[in-house]
């Protein structure tokens, strides 16, 4: 159950009160954020670009696996260790670095992440031994993985619940484009330059250009440092040239009353959130959906080469529709989250307007968000079954493309929905709470990638993805438990403030 006892990590009554009091839309005197729609668009673009290099770094590696196996004179099973290790570190690192971002600011941690990423890519492009490649891939993952969860923290800083869905959905969806088209980019680079090293040179150049852009246009948004954005940060690392642009500077009135009280750095903070029952039961379905998507991406290249005898470049082109599906998902889920929030909030306001303040239940934000997860959950299951059996019986390629579109679209939408809900529950710890999601999805993806070959050998492709679809159904049932507990918690709780109706 979502506990109502006071805790630094749980969305308590006290925390909820702060959220309700702070998240006021368009208050003329003290707006929740001075970031306009234009400023949020700039943030969406730069955060999506930064996160793109995190998500593309795993699948861009897949087309190079046969080449790397030959180059390092090793087996495919040994080479797959580098894939699994990458996913493990991609899950672990953000629980530390994203927590640093919640404490010391978003901007310096993001910039440091890009530096580590670029340095590791340069080193990988020059390595000649397998063990060093595997180690450097772990460093690469640890460096860049945190930017995904930090992006969600930024959304919590500058958006209220009413418009948060659009930003989280757009950023999460656009970032996951890298996951969808990574195979295409990797195949194109290998075909064009006939070298696996070109992949990491490409990542270095892309990361370097993004770093330069981030220096100039990525502002600090942590409410513990800049409040609603109107306070100039004290540390030079948190200062961005963007805040000195005339259109932004004129809104900076140094309103220190909007600064959220700082909390001490808690290394285990994200893990405390992770092991809360409701959070854990929300993360399980997200993790299995992402793991299923990763397994599809992994199987796609090997199965199309072995069963359909496609070239590396031809296989790469099959990844393109998945990237388009991610973009479509980001657009659909963001607008849907905001629309459904307004719809449910209107109904709630009508239901409680005649009740005394001390009898009004809290608005059920958990149900408002998770209700929309039903459709992508069904699409994921359908896509997995179609993919597995169409591959096994060598059906027309269009059926496989359609199935991968369903899987990619549903995974990106499902992740965005649950990410938004976590930020809603922990608006002042958005990066840390979202790192829990990253931890679960990466660890389950690592497990899925590790057992994929054994599953296919034991039950063929069709049976494998039918079983994976079954796991998705089983894990999705955990959301029923979450919704049941949320209904009890929000219906039994009192108002968030005794002075005015709760604002969402």
Swiss-Prot record:
Function: MFS antiporter that does not display functional linkage as drug transporter and performs functions that significantly affect biofilm development and virulence. No substrate for transport has been identified yet, but plays an important role in the growth in the host.
Segments in the Cytoplasmic topological domain: 1-41, 97-106, 156-169, 220-278, 333-370, 418-438, 484-504
Effect of loss of the gene: Leads to defects in biofilm architecture and attenuated virulence.
Keyword Transport in record: yes
Keywords carried by this UniProt record: Cell membrane, Membrane, Transmembrane, Transmembrane helix, Transport, Virulence
Organism, as annotated: Candida albicans (strain SC5314 / ATCC MYA-2876)
Cellular component, GO annotation: membrane raft; plasma membrane
Protein name: MFS antiporter QDR2
PROSITE patterns in UniProt: MFS
Location(s) in or outside the cell: Cell membrane
MF GO annotations: transmembrane transporter activity
Stored Gene3D superfamilies: MFS general substrate transporter like domains
């Amino acid at each position: 159950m979502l506990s109502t006892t006071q805790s630094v990590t749980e969305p308590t009554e006290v925390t909820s009160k702060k959220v309700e009091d702070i998240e006021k839309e368009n208050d003329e005197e003290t707006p929740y954020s001075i970031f306009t729609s234009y400023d949020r668009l700039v943030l969406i673009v730069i955060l999506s670009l930064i996160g793109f290099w995190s998500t593309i770094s795993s699948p861009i590696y897949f087309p190079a696996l046969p080449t790397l196996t030959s180059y390092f004179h090793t087996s495919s099973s040994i080479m797959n260790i580098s894939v699994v290790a990458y996913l493990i570190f991609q899950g672990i690192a953000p629980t530390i670095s994203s927590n640093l971002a919640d404490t010391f600011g978003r901007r310096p941690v993001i910039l440091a992440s890009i530096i580590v990423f670029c340095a590791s890519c340069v080193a990988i492009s020059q390595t000649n031994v397998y063990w060093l490649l595997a180690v450097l891939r772990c460093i690469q993952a640890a460096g860049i993985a945190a930017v995904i969860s930090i992006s969600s923290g930024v959304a919590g800083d500058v958006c209220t619940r009413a418009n948060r869905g659009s930003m989280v959905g757009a950023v999460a969806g656009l970032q996951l484009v890298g996951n969808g088209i990574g195979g295409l980019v990797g195949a194109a680079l290998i075909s064009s330059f006939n070298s696996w090293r070109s992949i990491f040179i490409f990542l270095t150049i892309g990361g370097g250009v993004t770093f330069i852009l981030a220096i100039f246009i990525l502002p600090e948004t942590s409410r513990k440092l800049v409040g609603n954005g109107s306070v100039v940060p004290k540390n030079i690392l948190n200062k961005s040239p963007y805040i000195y642009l005339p259109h932004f500077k004129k809104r900076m009135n140094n309103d220190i009353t909007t600064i959220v009280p700082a909390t001490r750095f808690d290394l285990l903070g994200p893990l405390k959130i992770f092991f809360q029952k409701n959070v854990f039961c929300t993360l399980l379905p997200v993790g299995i959906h992402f793991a299923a998507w990763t397994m599809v991406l992994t199987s796609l290249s090997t199965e199309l080469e072995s069963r359909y005898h496609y070239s590396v470049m031809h296989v790469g082109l099959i990844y393109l529709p998945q990237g388009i599906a991610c973009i479509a998902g980001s657009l659909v889920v963001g607008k849907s989250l905001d629309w459904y929030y307004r719809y449910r909030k209107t109904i709630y306001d009508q239901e409680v307007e005649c009740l005394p303040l001390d009898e009004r239940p809290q608005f059920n934000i958990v149900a408002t968000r998770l209700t929309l997860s039903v459709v992508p959950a069904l699409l994921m299951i359908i896509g997995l079954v179609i993919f597995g059996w169409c591959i096994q019986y060598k059906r027309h390629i269009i059926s496989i493309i359609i199935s991968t579109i369903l899987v990619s679209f549903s995974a990106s939408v499902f992740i965005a929905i649950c990410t938004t809900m976590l930020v809603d529950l922990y608006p002042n710890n958005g990066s840390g709470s979202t790192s829990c999601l990253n931890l679960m999805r990466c660890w389950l993806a690592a497990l899925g990638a590790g057992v994929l070959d054994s599953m296919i050998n034991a039950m063929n492709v069709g049976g494998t993805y039918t079983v994976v679809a079954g796991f998705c159904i089983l894990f999705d049932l955990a959301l029923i438990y979450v919704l049941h507990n949320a209904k009890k918690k929000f219906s039994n709780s009192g108002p968030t403030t005794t002075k005015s109706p709760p604002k969402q």
